[in-house]
């Protein structure tokens, strides 16, 4: 058996057994040793260089105090916390019973189908819903988008009835 045949059969054995991470040359072996040292050094340096997270208000920030007035107002308006819930007011149309209480809060990320299900469970019958007595939204629409477009004041008005009322 020649050296080439022996080397190829050893390579096949390594592939079959799954020990392909054995270094084939001295250079590969040296690279593996240096890689492990770099990993240890990287772990130590990231621990040492990891900054401590502190909460500094926008009014206390040195960088923001030196910004122009327009930029500061833009940053402050963007950084205000947003509400995660929106207010929904239900209004009945026709002979359908009024849901009580008429005002609810729901998550912005919810779909309009959750309102349909809620009303159908509360009333015990199928309902047709409209926003501002004009638009019947798709059940897959997110409430946040509908709220941004159709809100009146600080609430979304959802009218409902048991028959098709508009259009």
From Swiss-Prot:
Keywords carried by this UniProt record: Autophagy, Isopeptide bond, Membrane, Protein transport, Transport, Ubl conjugation pathway
Molecular function GO terms recorded: Atg8-family ligase activity
Biological process according to GO: autophagosome assembly; autophagosome maturation; autophagy of mitochondrion; glycophagy; piecemeal microautophagy of the nucleus; protein transport
Annotated localization: Preautophagosomal structure membrane
InterPro entries: Atg12, Ubiquitin-like_domsf
Signal sequence interval, chain numbering: none
Crosslink site: Glycyl lysine isopeptide (Gly-Lys) (interchain with K-135 in ATG5): 167
GO cellular component: Atg12-Atg5-Atg16 complex; autophagosome membrane; phagophore assembly site membrane
Primary residence: membrane
Domain of life: Eukaryota
Pfam family, one: APG12
Gene3D superfamilies named among the record's database cross-references: Phosphatidylinositol 3-kinase Catalytic Subunit, Chain A, domain 1
Membrane disposition: Peripheral membrane protein
Family, per entry: Belongs to the ATG12 family.
PANTHER family: AUTOPHAGY PROTEIN 12, UBIQUITIN-LIKE PROTEIN ATG12
Summary of the function given for this chain in its UniProt record: Ubiquitin-like protein involved in cytoplasm to vacuole transport (Cvt), autophagy vesicles formation, mitophagy, and nucleophagy. Conjugation with ATG5 through a ubiquitin-like conjugating system involving also ATG7 as an E1-like activating enzyme and ATG10 as an E2-like conjugating enzyme, is essential for its function. The ATG12-ATG5 conjugate functions as an E3-like enzyme which is required for lipidation of ATG8 and ATG8 association to the vesicle membranes.
Record text on subunit structure and interactions: Forms a conjugate with ATG5.
Name listed for the protein in its UniProt record: Ubiquitin-like protein ATG12
Protein's organism: Pichia angusta
Source lineage: Eukaryota, Fungi, Dikarya, Ascomycota, Saccharomycotina
